[in-house]
Each structure stands twice: as structure tokens, then as C-alpha cells.
């Protein structure tokens, strides 16, 4: 009898060990900064390096790959296929997203950009490979705290016009959410940050920059002696900017003429071409870039130090969580804009179009849940997901994985806004919010 009990106990230990292996995590980054010779204009500058950063996590049975890039890459299906074949990470367990910097290359968010799409795709595959090769025993933890840097940017002004400007009473998610992977010496292997705020500070300025996400990541990596890789992802930021974005202090003028807010609403189109700065304007341009540089440093440093604060005081760590992943594609009725010549503050008219497809994914690391959406979702959609999902440790990652067919994904309440985001969206009103929220909830239900 005693022998039988010992045998049963040994069997129990073996089964328990098989189902609860030590978590391992690794991280890496690959430089994708363009060369100075690739800059589009002689007056353009490179403010700092651009990276693809990756985190690999495995529980011994399954794995996930989390990637952030300081540029954009829309052809991710083939990248995921290649990386899945190389690393063994299931395709549904990838979260690849852009930091959404508007200055992440020689053409910003334009098509003719360096780094090229091919360079970015290769860097993603390489970064995940390197992250897996660096994997070591780890603990994982989740934390969040409010960080008051952002503001809703859908504003109906005193002239009864819609414009892109600070709206202090509209919804805005202030949570900075952080997932940390610690090694056995309590050094962060990787830090995954999430915050909703557009990195638009160097948009159309001729400056190549990762903007505040890059500054935040660089700070954390520097604090921990470059033993850590920090990755940034966007939350629900479709209608959110930094508080001082596009204000008078960042106008290219020879003298700041006070603290009034410029009147920005426009019916006309926006010229997205960046021109060479003239010799006469160069000093003024450099002064503006210097002001933006200081502001971006402040945003990045505030975010980076707040993330470290969260890691120290608001995070409980787990050793052996299980990893799960799932994804779905939802179809939302589409529309085609008739008048495409204006920017905002008018109704362009629409005709019905084919359905637009939006990817919704879910990755779980123990009791931590990451929901990904393949578009720029409005704040109210993100807040609704947080409110209705039956989990407290939740991160919402926007601009992830694809397909990228929708344009901005505005909330039901924002359907009447004549901002450039809403009138440019390829989605009919009243459908996307419900479909995304329900898809996320169903994925979580199916995972249990």
C-alpha cells in the first residue's frame, strides 16, 4: 500500500511538472534606422534610431511573440508565417504592432519610405529569432497607473466647427499599462508598455524620430544597463493626442506671439508633402525642432519613469503561467467617400461599399489578457472593452497584426463628428464598436 502511494505521488509530481513548467522569456531589438544618404531632403535630420523590438515568451508547451516597431508594416501575414515556422510560435499567438510614430522613416507615414517594407519585415523575423535565442527563466507581472499626458483631440469649437484640438471634457484613457518579465536576478528581461496617445510631434517636419515611444523605451533600457528591451504599443488612441500637439508654441514662426490657441478647423485638404526648408527659414525651423525635442524628451521620460514605478510598486509576479492565443476576423459594413478633396469639418457623402475586415486577437499569459485590434480604435471602444471584459489584468493593443482595411475605427458616439478621422473612415456607423467588443468577449470565453 505504501509503495502504491509513493508511486501515485511520484506520478502526481510528474503530471504537475508537465503542466506547470518554468516560464522563459527573451527579448531583442534590430536597428532599422535609415542612412543619412537616404534622407529625402538636405535639411532633413535623424533625431534618433528606429528599432524593431521583440519579446519571446514560452511556458514549455506554447509560446507568444510580441513585437513593436518604430515604423509601419502592413504586410504582416507573410511575416507571421515565416516567424512561426522559424520559432514554433503559433500564428494566432503573435502580436505585432506599430508604435505609430508619424516620423518613423524618411517619408514619415508615407508610401516611399526608408526603411522599406522589406527591411522591416526581415527585421521582425530576425528580432523574434534573436529573442527566442536569448530566452531564460522568467517571472511575469502586470501593473498599471494613471499618466496624465494625453487629451482627446475631437473638438467642436466656439465657431461650431470640428477641429483637431484639445477637448478636455471628452473621454480619454489615462492608464499606462505595463507587463514586465523579470529574470532570476530581478533584472527586467523585457518591459511591454501600452498607452493611448498619437506620436505626432515630428509629423511632416523632416525629422526622423521614434517620438516619445522611442524616448520611453530608450530610458528604461538605459536605466537597466541595456540588459533590458522595452517595447511600446498603442492603446485606444484614435482620438487622442499629446496635450500640446499642434499648439502655437510649435508653429514655425520667428516669435511666439502669446499663448492663444490657433484656429485649426479647415475644409480644405492637407498637403502631406514635406518640402526642403529654405535658407531664410532654417534657423526658425531648427528652433521649432529644438522645442519639440524637449517636449518629446519630457513625454518619454515621464512615461519611462512611470513604467519603472509600476514595475516596483504595482506588480505581482508569477512563475509558471500558461500561454494561450486565439484570433478572429470580423466583417463590418463598409462605405466609400464621395468627396475626397477636403480634410475635415464637412460631410463628404458616402456610397455603400464592400465589408471591411478587422482582426481581433487574444493572448493570455496566465491571468494577464492582451486584446489586439487591427486598427486605430477610439477611446470609447477601448474603455468599453475594459468595462465589459471579465478580467482586471487587461491590455488593449491597437494597430496590430492586420488586416488593415478600415481606417480609423470610431465609436458609436463619435459617428457624427466631422473630424478627419471619422469622415475618412471606411466603416459605416453603428457596427464596428459592437462587433469588436463582442469578438473580444467571445475569444476570452472560448479560452476558458
Q: Each predicted region: which residue ranges?
A:
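Positively charged n-region of N-terminal signal peptides that target proteins for export
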Residues: 1-4
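Short amphipathic alpha-helical "recognition" segments used for binding
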Residues: 6-7, 123
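Bacterial N-terminal signal peptides
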Residues: 7-16
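Conserved beta-alpha junction segments in alpha/beta enzyme cores
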Residues: 21-98, 105-259, 268-299, 304-448
Amino acid at each position: 500500500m505504501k509503495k502504491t502511494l509513493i508511486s501515485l505521488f511520484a506520478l502526481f509530481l510528474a503530471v504537475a511538472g508537465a503542466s506547470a513548467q518554468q516560464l522563459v522569456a527573451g527579448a531583442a531589438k534590430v536597428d532599422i534606422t535609415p542612412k543619412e544618404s537616404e534622407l529625402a531632403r538636405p535639411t532633413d535630420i535623424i533625431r534618433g534610431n528606429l528599432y524593431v523590438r521583440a519579446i519571446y515568451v514560452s511556458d514549455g508547451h506554447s509560446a507568444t511573440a510580441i513585437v513593436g516597431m518604430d515604423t509601419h508594416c502592413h504586410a504582416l501575414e507573410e511575416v507571421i508565417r515565416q516567424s512561426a515556422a522559424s520559432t514554433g510560435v503559433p500564428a494566432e499567438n503573435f502580436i505585432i504592432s506599430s508604435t505609430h510614430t508619424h516620423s518613423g522613416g524618411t517619408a514619415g507615414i508615407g508610401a516611399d519610405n526608408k526603411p522599406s517594407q522589406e527591411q522591416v519585415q526581415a527585421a521582425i523575423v530576425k528580432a523574434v529569432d534573436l529573442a527566442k535565442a536569448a530566452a531564460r527563466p522568467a517571472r511575469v507581472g502586470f501593473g498599471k497607473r494613471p499618466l496624465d499626458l494625453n487629451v482627446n483631440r475631437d473638438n467642436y469649437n466656439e465657431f461650431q466647427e470640428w477641429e483637431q484640438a484639445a477637448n478636455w471634457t471628452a473621454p480619454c484613457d489615462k492608464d499606462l499599462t505595463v507587463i514586465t518579465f523579470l529574470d532570476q536576478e530581478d533584472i527586467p528581461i523585457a518591459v511591454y508598455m501600452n498607452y493611448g496617445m498619437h506620436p505626432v510631434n515630428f509629423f511632416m517636419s523632416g525629422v526622423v524620430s521614434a517620438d516619445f515611444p522611442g524616448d520611453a523605451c530608450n530610458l528604461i533600457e538605459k536605466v537597466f544597463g541595456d540588459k533590458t528591451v522595452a517595447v511600446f504599443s498603442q492603446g485606444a488612441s484614435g482620438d487622442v493626442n499629446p496635450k500640446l500637439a499642434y499648439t502655437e508654441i510649435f508653429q514655425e514662426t520667428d516669435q511666439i506671439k502669446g499663448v492663444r490657441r490657433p484656429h485649426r478647423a479647415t475644409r480644405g485638404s492637407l498637403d502631406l508633402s514635406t518640402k526642403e526648408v529654405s535658407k531664410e527659414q532654417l534657423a526658425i525651423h531648427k528652433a521649432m525642432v529644438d522645442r519639440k525635442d524637449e517636449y518629446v524628451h519630457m513625454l518619454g521620460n515621464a512615461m519611462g519613469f512611470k513604467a519603472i514605478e509600476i514595475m516596483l510598486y504595482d506588480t505581482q509576479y508569477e512563475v509558471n503561467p500558461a500561454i494561450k492565443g486565439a484570433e478572429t476576423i470580423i466583417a463590418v459594413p463598409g462605405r466609400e467617400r464621395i468627396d475626397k478633396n477636403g480634410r475635415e469639418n464637412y460631410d463628404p457623402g458616402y456610397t455603400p461599399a464592400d465589408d471591411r475586415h478587422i482582426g481581433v486577437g487574444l493572448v493570455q499569459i496566465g491571468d494577464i489578457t492582451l486584446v489586439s485590434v487591427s486598427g486605430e480604435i477610439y477611446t470609447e471602444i477601448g474603455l468599453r472593452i475594459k468595462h465589459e471584459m471579465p478580467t482586471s489584468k487587461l491590455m488593449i493593443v491597437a494597430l496590430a497584426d492586420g488586416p488593415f482595411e478600415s481606417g480609423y475605427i470610431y465609436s458609436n458616439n463619435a459617428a457624427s463628428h466631422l473630424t478627419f478621422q471619422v469622415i475618412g473612415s471606411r466603416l459605416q456607423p453603428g457596427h464596428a464598436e459592437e462587433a469588436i467588443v463582442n469578438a473580444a468577449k467571445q475569444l476570452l470565453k472560448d479560452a476558458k
